[in-house]
């Protein structure tokens, strides 16, 4: 981001922009009270929000929507699963990612759903050294060293909500394909299946997916 529009080479394969919402806010489940996302550069006790998420919750879309509602139209997305396992290299990669976010004046969303609990703690500790607002998405049972008011538990979205995701994305993509096993799929997974068929599915999707019921009237 120093004039050439490219990320630091150490994190180029870890980072991506999240600018256009995949799902409108009215199609996302209500998470109840959500911690304040502080303004960029402000001094505060913690700039981190942890979302403990079940699969099929729409967590990434919820995180992006919450940032958008807080005045951040785009965010830098970091996939923690691809961070180096070496502690020193991991630290350098996280710091380089925070630097990219600072240079772009954007908050971050860190997807930590596919890493072990001890790695989650390590990544959060590294992120907490910065004043960049960060939403960290973890698995549902991960214990994190953050104040309770900085933690949000996000359940699996109701069948009617996931049904609305499918209808919305099908209309957006104009795809003749169908998705009949998306009980715990995220909107990103549904979109991938509509675009590429059932043979392509997110690596984070569980193997015990059921069939989505299609209620007549979605309720949120």
Kindly give the residue locations of the regions a language model identified.
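AAA+ P-loop ATPase motor domain of ring mechanoenzymes
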Residues: 1-74, 80-83, 96, 133-220
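Conserved P-loop NTPase "ATPase switch" module shared by AAA+ and STAND
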Residues: 76-138
């Amino acid at each position: 981001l120093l004039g050439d529009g490219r990320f630091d080479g150490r994190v180029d394969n870890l980072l991506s922009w999240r600018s256009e919402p995949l799902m409108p806010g009215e199609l996302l489940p209500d998470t109840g009270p959500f911690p304040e996302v502080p303004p960029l550069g402000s001094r505060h006790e913690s700039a981190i929000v942890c979302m403990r998420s079940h699969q099929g919750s729409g967590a990434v879309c919820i995180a992006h929507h919450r940032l958008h509602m807080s005045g951040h139209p785009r965010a830098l997305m970091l996939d923690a699963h691809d961070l180096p396992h070496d502690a020193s290299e991991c630290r350098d990669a996280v710091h380089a990612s925070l630097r990219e976010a600072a240079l772009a004046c954007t908050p971050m969303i860190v997807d930590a759903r596919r890493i072990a609990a001890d790695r989650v703690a390590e990544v959060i500790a590294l992120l907490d050294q910065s004043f960049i607002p960060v939403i960290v998405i973890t698995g549902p049972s991960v214990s994190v060293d953050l104040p309770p008011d900085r933690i949000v538990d996000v359940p699996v979205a109701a069948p009617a909500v996931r049904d609305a995701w499918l209808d919305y994305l099908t209309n957006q993509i104009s795809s003749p394909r169908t998705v009949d096993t998306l009980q715990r799929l995220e909107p990103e997974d549904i979109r991938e299946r509509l675009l590429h068929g059932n043979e392509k599915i997110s690596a984070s999707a569980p193997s015990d997916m059921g069939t989505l019921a299609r209620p007549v009237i979605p309720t949120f």
